[in-house]
A protein has these predicted regions:
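Short, charged, surface-exposed secondary-structure boundary motifs
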Residues: 146-157, 263-268
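Gly/serine-rich nucleotide phosphate-binding loop at the start of the catalytic core
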Residues: 1-129, 141, 146-148, 304-306
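Short, flexible loop segments at the rims of nucleotide/cofactor-binding pockets, characterized by
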Residues: 93-102, 202-210, 232-234
């Protein structure tokens, strides 16, 4: 993005320039890589090791690559996806429980300040928004932690009492008995996965319920007069959600992200709303730097810094 700021979104179709998993590496490079990673284990931060580690352990990339095993019949990728997806699910369930316990006597940051007369669509998996607004006012666009899917029948099954769920116990007592990869024929195997829609550009339909949810989300945006989008990057993998906003250009839309006024974010907004970067005017919104064009305001702020009630009133 620093070298080609104007063309970055067109040139970049993934988060990495190199796919290190598929490279043929020389012995010299392998030696340097090992030494670099060892340095990264020292107490002092090592930037190269951190970058390499982040790339090789990118959970989104791993989920995308391994989920495709269900479509190209690769048992090894399917097994890897089961492991990665349930590990991610277990981590999120444990962290969710930890956060809720830590804020048992106080409101959650950001979520605790969401006005209760709103309807909200979230692309996060955690239950924080539903805890604040209730299930009837919340749509989990990419699924959530409280359901899982049997892949051969597309049955969407609930996780009992997700807020108090012991993830290790659930995997041991529910997931393991429902997974069978012993047969060589994939059609004879049985897989259950968390109901988390992987970050593919072409979104898989894990269950018919998601068709209904995405239609309902579009209807909510259609009915709204003012839409506030918080902490969402509008990346290409979520083009199906971007298109919902694109199809309703007459709505007042506030977009709150720290990089809202940056060059690369403006280029992204041009793709979504069709408004050239030079059409935006600099303004202030509740004390924050912002840009405005037509009915769209780009507000440079973090989620916890904004007051949603004031934005709706302003």
């Amino acid at each position: 993005r620093e070298v080609f700021p104007k063309d970055a979104d067109e040139l970049i179709d993934s988060d990495s320039i190199l796919d290190i998993h598929k490279l043929s590496l020389s012995d010299t490079f392998k030696t340097v890589l090992k030494r670099t990673l060892k340095l990264g284990l020292s107490s002092e931060r090592h930037e190269v090791a951190a970058a390499l580690g982040a790339d090789m352990l990118n959970i989104e990339t791993l989920l995308i690559e391994k989920f495709l095993g269900f479509y190209n019949d690769k048992p090894a990728d399917i097994k890897n996806y089961l492991y990665i997806a349930w590990a991610l699910w277990a981590y999120l369930v444990a962290k969710q429980k930890e956060v809720l316990e830590a804020h048992a006597a106080s409101p959650l940051p950001f979520y605790g300040k969401v006005p209760d007369d709103l309807r909200a669509i979230t692309l996060n998996y955690t239950a924080f928004l539903e805890q604040s607004l209730g299930a009837a006012k919340t749509i989990y666009f990419h699924g959530g932690l409280s359901d899982y899917v049997r892949m051969d029948t597309r049955d969407l099954l609930p996780v009992d009492d997700i807020l108090n769920c012991d993830p290790a116990k659930f995997i041991r007592e529910v997931v393991t008995p429902n997974v069978d990869v012993s047969a060589d024929d994939l059609r004879q195997q049985r897989h259950v996965i968390p109901a988390l829609v992987p970050p593919l550009r072409l979104k898989p339909i894990l269950s018919h319920r998601y068709i209904e949810l995405w239609s309902q989300a579009s209807e909510w945006v259609k009915q709204a007069e003012h839409v506030i989008v918080v902490g969402y990057s509008f990346n290409n993998a979520d083009e199906h959600f971007n298109d919902i906003l694109r199809c309703h250009p007459d709505r007042r839309i506030d977009i709150v992200v720290p990089e809202a006024t940056s060059t690369h974010f403006l280029a992204r907004m041009e793709k979504v709303f069709g408004t050239a970067a030079n059409q935006y005017n600099k303004i202030k919104v509740n004390g924050f730097d912002a840009l405005k064009a037509k009915k769209v305001r780009l507000i440079a702020a973090k989620a916890g810094e904004v007051n949603l009630s004031e934005l709706f009133a302003n």
